[in-house]
Amino acid sequence: MGVNQSVGFPPVTGPHLVGCGDVMEGQNLQGSFFRLFYPCQKAEETMEQPLWIPRYEYCTGLAEYLQFNKRCGGLLFNLAVGSCRLPVSWNGPFKTKDSGYPLIIFSHGLGAFRTLYSAFCMELASRGFVVAVPEHRDRSAATTYFCKQAPEENQPTNESLQEEWIPFRRVEEGEKEFHVRNPQVHQRVSECLRVLKILQEVTAGQTVFNILPGGLDLMTLKGNIDMSRVAVMGHSFGGATAILALAKETQFRCAVALDAWMFPLERDFYPKARGPVFFINTEKFQTMESVNLMKKICAQHEQSRIITVLGSVHRSQTDFAFVTGNLIGKFFSTETRGSLDPYEGQEVMVRAMLAFLQKHLDLKEDYNQWNNLIEGIGPSLTPGAPHHLSSL
């Protein structure tokens, strides 16, 4: 009956092969869990390719977030895409670089998790970035987990760790959504800063233990990240996270906000906002109120920009844009792709990002050939926001 779907990830266009691995640091809720995408060497043997949806629990988490029956929806999600794999080397050998690679911290959106932006992350890694994607523990992820020591074990080992799962937090009837989402966005920023600190320590040669069995060996990163060239990026709730993180941490030199959901940011934040921020919006998500808040930030920072990708929808900036077949689309109340071909959309957004990152991280690349895209001049782009905006 055509249950199996596939994910047609765009082939990467950069000069580097891409590796990825997961890192969990700390044995409590305050620890850190993130996926790392990075330039890797060609391995002598065939490397394993990781699953796109890393575990069955994420299928049930997605079903629950989308308000489907957890058991049936999870089963269908798993049948549809549970066997899809990422075209990267799992824990592949890190490709060393004396001057280090620039770093991007990428924050996922509401109801997402660390693997749902793999198309962007793989492409950026192929272009010579290390990309870290924290899986947020503020209960905005579809689901996530942490590992803690089993109570009966005296001698801690990786094998004696117990998983504790964290479900998605829905706003209850009668609750004000802002009072839920605002503390979450602040926690998300703290989690991004913890990942930044971990990678800073590893780069400096300090020992940081990855407690995941068979997880990525962080010591291979020593001296290979250029901590003077760091950007923060995110989609939707992650876009708001990136904007707030830029204001809180001066080590971030710029932010890229993909279809940022501005709602969780408190109004008195805006005078303290830093730039430059590059807002890359889709055509069918933003409201005039939201765009006006973006304009407030742009008015304070002349290098900040807003562009809109015409023919795109909110999920055009996630991996769901590349899922073929109709089954997954039935789970979503809104479209997973717009009228713009998703591969064309990915290409123009990545090129715009790269031009912006070159400009503000002082990269020695040729991405300035796409500087016109930063101004919203190019195929399927418009500067600012279109006149006819959707109402959420």
Curated annotation (Swiss-Prot):
InterPro entries: AB_hydrolase_fold, PAF_acetylhydro_eukaryote. It is a lipid-anchor. GO terms for molecular function: 1-alkyl-2-acetylglycerophosphocholine esterase activity; phospholipid binding; platelet-activating factor acetyltransferase activity. Inhibited by phenylmethanesulfonyl fluoride, 3,4,dichloroisocoumarin, diisopropyl fluorophosphate (DFP) and diethyl p-nitrophenyl phosphate (DENP). One of its GO terms (cellular component) is cytoplasm. The keyword Membrane applies. Signal peptide: none annotated. Belongs to the serine esterase family. This is Platelet-activating factor acetylhydrolase 2, cytoplasmic. It comes from Homo sapiens (Human). The gene is PAFAH2.
